[in-house]
C-alpha cells in the first residue's frame, strides 16, 4: 500500500507529509486579570461571552449579544439584564466595582460596557479580606431568571435599583 501511495504522490506532485516537529511559541495572552475579574487587554478587543464564577465552583455564562440595560448603583451593585430564551437578571455586589485596574480597565464603564470583561468571580470571605485597599471586591453574584411575560420572583434585592432610576 505504501508503494501505491508513493506512486500516486509522485505522479500528482503531492508533497510527502512533513515529519518535522513544529514548535509554536505563545507570544502572550490577550487576557489579563485581577482577583475579581478577567479582561481583554486590547482597547478594541471584545469578548463574545461573560462568565460568572461562583465561590462554590459553579459558573454560568451568557453571550454579550444578550446583554441589555445595565444599572450601576455604588451602594447596591451592578445589575445586568440578559435577554435570550428567558430574561436573566444578574446582580454583582461588592465594593470598588468601578475602580481602575492597572490604570486601563474597570469592571463597569471600561469593562462590561465595552464588552472587555470575560469573567467575574465571586470571592470567598478570605479572598475579600486579603484584597488590597481600593481593589475591586466581588462579595456576591445573584442570578434570577423569569419569562418575559412574568415578573421575577424572590428577587427583593431589585428594589434598590427601582429607586436609582
Walk through the language-model features, giving the residues of each.
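Glycine-centered tight beta-turn/hairpin loop motif at sheet-sheet or coil-to-beta transitions
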Residues: 55-57, 83-87
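Short acidic, Gly/Pro-enriched loop/turn segments at secondary-structure junctions
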Residues: 73-84
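Short aromatic-glycine motifs in intrinsically disordered, low-complexity regions
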Residues: 47-61
Amino acid at each position: 500500500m505504501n508503494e501505491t501511495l508513493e506512486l500516486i504522490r509522485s505522479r500528482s506532485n503531492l508533497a510527502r507529509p512533513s515529519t518535522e516537529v513544529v514548535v509554536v511559541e505563545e507570544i502572550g495572552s490577550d487576557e489579563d486579570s485581577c482577583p475579581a475579574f478577567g479582561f481583554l487587554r486590547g482597547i478594541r478587543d471584545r469578548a463574545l461571552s461573560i462568565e460568572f464564577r461562583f465561590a462554590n465552583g459553579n459558573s454560568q455564562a451568557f453571550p454579550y449579544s444578550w446583554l441589555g440595560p445595565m444599572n450601576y448603583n455604588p451602594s447596591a451593585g451592578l445589575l445586568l439584564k440578559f435577554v435570550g430564551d428567558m430574561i436573566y437578571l444578574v446582580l454583582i455586589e461588592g465594593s470598588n466595582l468601578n475602580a481602575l485596574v492597572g490604570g486601563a480597565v474597570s469592571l463597569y464603564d471600561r469593562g462590561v460596557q465595552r464588552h472587555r470583561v470575560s469573567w467575574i468571580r465571586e470571592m470567598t470571605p478570605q479572598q475579600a479580606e486579603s484584597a488590597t485597599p481600593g481593589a475591586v471586591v466581588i462579595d456576591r453574584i445573584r442570578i434570577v431568571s423569569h419569562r418575559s411575560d412574568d415578573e421575577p420572583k424572590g428577587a427583593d434585592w431589585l428594589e434598590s435599583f427601582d429607586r436609582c432610576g
